[in-house]
A protein has these predicted regions:
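Active-site beta-loop-alpha junctions enriched in small/polar residues
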Residues: 10, 48-50, 72-74, 105-107, ...
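Mid-chain, structured segments of secreted extracytoplasmic proteins
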Residues: 1-2, 13
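C-terminal domain-boundary segment and adjacent tail
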Residues: 109-143
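Structural recognition of the beta-strand scaffold that forms the well-ordered cores
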Residues: 4-7, 43-46, 66-70, 100-104, ...
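Alpha-helical scaffold elements within enzyme catalytic domains, especially in hydrolases
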Residues: 1, 59, 119-120
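Alpha-helical scaffold elements lining the catalytic groove of polysaccharide deacetylases
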Residues: 13-41, 51-98, 110-116
């Protein structure tokens, strides 16, 4: 399993605070930059702070991207910025359920907790899947 490169905007701005045109620029500039680097446009969009707007949803759809939001995450909270605490909460939170999409940032504590998180999830019977699998499952459920 490799990594899917998605669109998370150019500057991580709070989209509800931006005009429609500014939201469009945030989203399209990122897709263009990703395409210039890897040769393909992102297929998924995740709004900063999970704050989608009607405009951001429409812009993402026009660009052929699916929304890929998260279920829960803790690595941005100071009490979980150490590997043991982060691994414990990520595996034992009440928000863990079938289809959960875990929010994990590129931080040292997250890197250091990753193996424990994966092991803990697998021990509970969960499997790691790529974003395409999640998107396909959501489409099937909506039908």
């Amino acid at each position: 399993m490799g990594f899917e490169i998605g669109n998370h905007t150019e500057t991580h701005a709070s989209l509800p605070e931006l005009s429609v045109e500014a939201q469009r620029e945030e989203i399209t500039a990122t897709s263009e930059r990703v395409e210039a680097i890897i040769g393909e446009r992102p297929r998924f969009f995740r709004a900063p702070f999970g704050q989608n707007t009607e405009a951001s949803r429409e812009i993402a759809e026009e660009a052929g991207m699916e929304l890929m939001n998260w279920t829960y995450g803790y690595d941005w909270e100071s009490e979980y910025q150490n590997a043991p605490a982060l691994a414990d909460i990520m595996v034992n939170t009440e928000y863990l359920n079938h289809g959960a999409n875990l929010l994990m940032h590129d931080r040292a504590c997250t890197r250091d907790a990753s193996a424990q998180i994966v092991e803990g999830l697998r021990d509970k019977g969960y499997a790691l899947v790529d974003p395409e699998t999640i998107a396909s499952s959501e489409k099937e459920a909506a039908q």
